[in-house]
Curated annotation (Swiss-Prot):
It comes from Enterobacteria phage T4. Homodimer. This is Double-stranded DNA-binding protein. Keywords: DNA replication, DNA-binding. Pfam families: Phage_DsbA. Disulfide bonds: none annotated. The keyword Electron transport does not apply.
Amino acid sequence: MAKKEMVEFDEAIHGEDLAKFIKEASDHKLKISGYNELIKDIRIRAKDELGVDGKMFNRLLALYHKDNRDVFEAETEEVVELYDTVFSK
């Protein structure tokens, strides 16, 4: 596989394209901000309507979204086992 040649930024040549990339990325950040507000509203509803703490909601959301329950369980179990070993009375 051939190495890709590095491009050196030249404002005169690449400036307009860079501005387009920045504007495109900014548009995506604006959408993300909007979605984050929607998630915040859902988290508040879960707290108000179901009594679920916001921190717990966030942890469950991350666990569900990343679909890594097994990894989380294994890591948590490992930490608890080590804790019990180190701090056993």
